Amino acid sequence: MGIAHTEWESVIGLEVHVELNTESKLFSPARNHFGDEPNTNISPVCTGMPGSLPVLNKDAVRKAVLFGCAVEGDVALFSRFDRKSYFYPDSPRNFQITQYEHPIVRGGCIRAVVEGEEKTFELAQTHLEDDAGMLKHFGDFAGVDYNRAGVPLIEIVSKPCMFSAEDAVAYANALVSILGYIGISDCNMEEGSIRFDVNISVRPRGSRELRNKVEIKNMNSFTFMAQALEAEKRRQIEEYLSYPNEDPKKVVPAATYRWDPEKKKTVLMRLKERAEDYMYFVEPDLPVLQITETYIDEVRQTLPELPHSKYMRYITDFDIAEDLAMILVSDRHTAHFFETATMSCKNYRALSNWITVEFAGRCKARGKTLPFTGILPEWVAQLVNFIDRGVITGKIAKEIADRMVSSFGESPEDILRRHPSLLPMTDDHALRAIVKEVVAQNTASVADYKNGKAKALGFLVGQIMKRTEGKAPPKRVNELLLAAMRDM
């Protein structure tokens, strides 16, 4: 990117549609469940039959209020539904029921760590609305599945408070973590239960103006989100640089784009509609939604400890690395696994590394995550304790971890009982002989160590561990090696 490009910055906001995991739809008793046969979870309400009337789902309201409390938003005592009119085959009523002017939650914030820096991203509002159906294409024809029509959504709208792709991805990750902790959505991006639309404009660095924004629809991975934002930033900057004397509104018009991952570029879908094009008006078949302060307080009391609070506690109380703490708290199941393991092991740093690095990598290779493998937290704690007590070496511990992930049903103790060959070397006489032999064969390294080159000691230890196949106790190896070199 040239110097001219570095003189510009992105201004980014996100609109996130989250399907709520209620039993039934937002305004009808039809089942809310993904993956069923097409058009089996429908009712007169969600298919727009004449005379059908919507009835608001109480559980959807509670989940929206719970989210508002989680992000410290202002939950409205009075909110209202509106009709957003548009024609499309997946909208059988030709309108969506949403909250245009009076949302259920205003404000709030999402806290995230971006490249080691803690940032707070402000929310504009969160509102309830129902989802559309799905168009499915089959060669030369298309079908409509209304199973999703009427599924309850919250749309979470941020302020334009992000200034890089890294900001946007960190915000999105933090948001998904919060939703997972409070349990209001499964956030399955592949199934579309959470969908990210990103809005981006650019401006000269130091400027406060907000130029026309471009919306990039339906980001279904964080990798694509980052790529799309970077590509669109470049496109807009190049447009402005190509037409420096033109009206900025004409150079980059407000529009909706999609991301093409193969071409690595954003592709125009349509120019932006205006609000009046949707002909918003008050939903006549629903009363004003009224809730009480008492109800909001009752919902707030059910909040669990949230990811950011847990993250701060981990790095202060457990003194673990910030990057590992972030991985641990990103998923509530992993955090629970770690905290259960800490009841049996007090080497928190080693424990966090084994959970987030060693076991996570092994489990990922098998398409699983550690909390859902059958491996108990106590077993990982036992493995770390065995290393700390010198029962096994780090190399043997990795072999045991391999076997734990392969079997998903054995503790380190069970594995050592069945495979005594994994136990460390206990023959001190044989170990002394190996140390003596290594020292005799590497006199240059011994001399280097005596001349102050600390790395030479590591080399000698490595040679001994190689000959013992990693089974020699490291502490004993160091003791014998230092003694042997002193005697030379």
UniProtKB/Swiss-Prot annotation:
Enzyme class: ligase
Keyword Ligase set for record: yes
Enzyme Commission no: 6.3.5.-
Keywords for the protein's UniProt record, in alphabetical order: ATP-binding, Ligase, Nucleotide-binding, Protein biosynthesis
InterPro entries per the UniProt record, alphabetical: Asn/Gln-tRNA_amidoTrfase_suB/E (IPR017959), Asn/Gln-tRNA_Trfase_suB/E_cat (IPR006075), Asn/Gln_amidotransferase (IPR018027), Asn/Gln_tRNA_amidoTrase-B-like (IPR003789), GatB (IPR004413), GatB_C_1 (IPR042114), GatB_Yqey_C_2 (IPR023168), Gln-tRNA_amidoTrfase_suB_CS (IPR017958)
Superkingdom per UniProt: Bacteria
Gene Ontology MF term list: asparaginyl-tRNA synthase (glutamine-hydrolyzing) activity; ATP binding; glutaminyl-tRNA synthase (glutamine-hydrolyzing) activity
Gene Ontology BP term (one): glutaminyl-tRNAGln biosynthesis via transamidation
Catalytic function, reaction form: L-glutamyl-tRNA(Gln) + L-glutamine + ATP + H2O = L-glutaminyl-tRNA(Gln) + L-glutamate + ADP + phosphate + H(+); L-aspartyl-tRNA(Asn) + L-glutamine + ATP + H2O = L-asparaginyl-tRNA(Asn) + L-glutamate + ADP + phosphate + 2 H(+)
Chain segments annotated as transmembrane: none
SUPFAM superfamilies: GatB/YqeY motif, Glutamine synthetase/guanido kinase
Protein's UniProt keywords contain tRNA-binding: no
Function: Allows the formation of correctly charged Asn-tRNA(Asn) or Gln-tRNA(Gln) through the transamidation of misacylated Asp-tRNA(Asn) or Glu-tRNA(Gln) in organisms which lack either or both of asparaginyl-tRNA or glutaminyl-tRNA synthetases. The reaction takes place in the presence of glutamine and ATP through an activated phospho-Asp-tRNA(Asn) or phospho-Glu-tRNA(Gln).
Protein family according to the UniProt entry: Belongs to the GatB/GatE family. GatB subfamily.
Oligomer status and interactors: Heterotrimer of A, B and C subunits.
Matching NCBIfam families: gatB, PRK05477.1-2, PRK05477.1-4
Name used for this protein in its record: Aspartyl/glutamyl-tRNA(Asn/Gln) amidotransferase subunit B
